[in-house]
Amino acid sequence: VLLMSCFFAYRILTFSNSEPMGYLLARLICFVFALLIILQNIKSKVTIWGPTFLAVSYVLIVTFNILIFTQTSINDFTDAALWPLLFLTIYEVTAQNCISEVSLFRILKITKIVCLGYSFVLVIEHILGIIPGTSEMFPTYVLLALVPFSLYEMDMEHGIKFNVIYLICTFLIMLMTSKRSCILVLAVGIMGYFLVKAKIQGRNVKAIVNKMAKYIFAILVIFFAMYFVTKLMKLDIVERLNEMLNGDTNGRSAIWENVLEAFNASTLSKKMIGHGYHAFRFYKYSGYMYILNGNLAHNDYLNTLYDYGIIGVAVYVSFLLSMIKELLLLIKKKSEIAPAFTFSIVLLGFLTFVSYFGIESRIINYVAIFWGYTLAIKRFDIKN
């Protein structure tokens, strides 16, 4: 935790990429932090837990790529290494019972209020065109990434009214921004949440179907209400949903083909260990494809394959699969964590294929904290 504090203090104080020695120090701290976690497990004679090992491995792969490939000079190393370090840190701190759940929920409440306010302002600016080029994308996705914690808090019977309001506001913002993947994640994720919750509570199929029918009806009512509102505001929600249903990927298929062509043209060593952090973003993403208002491949697996090679994508996919395995174990044991955890896996499933998730430490951060916190509680049976 001390090493992490030093690292982020350094990043705050030096917001420039003109200091190579400082960047070397920042990378070295990440490397040492990862090794210390392994040594701690060995010294305490505790079997290294699979996801912990995979998260450490991912940090080491990112560090190796940035140290070796000088062409991938970056202005923010935390983009790559932050989320696995957050997962490791919150897991270790929670496992040692050094965190108060009440304090965590208070911090999350403040975070949600700030993110909601920020997102509403950006969405209004975007709709009215007050500030040209205003991007509401990442505040919107951050709202989505905080949903698993809201569902978990409600299951713990903490702040139910506030979190219901938060979920409603989040859904309205998704409709206003016409983010198709976000709308689908919310719809499918909440359905999955109710289904798993009904299963672990031992309710019958009829009760589940009735619950889902009411939920779908509520969504349709809200959707049609928003449809008439957005017609007046000249938004394109219905048009964008229609494009999605007709298979229009907004140029993504062309980018995916470009990634595969670039990867196939690489040397064997590059295919194995990758081209370096954000190599595709800075060196292969150009021309007409830049209209996608982003710089990545819009597919985590292809992006990771090009940047970190076969080894990197194998570690990344293995970590994500380990989270799916944990969900199945939670459902099998009828854990109260399982319903909220289900939403996080739905989020993973959609965003890794058609948007951003773990390739940058933005959307995934709160999900990584949620995974580390809840899995430490489950693994060590921590109370209060």
Question: What is each PLM-predicted segment?
Answer:
Residues 42, 307-349:
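Hydrophobic transmembrane alpha-helices and their immediate junctions
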Residues 132, 246-308:
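Long extracytoplasmic/lumenal interhelical loops at the membrane interface
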Residues 205-211, 223-258, 282-285:
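Flexible juxtamembrane loops connecting transmembrane helices in multi-pass membrane enzymes
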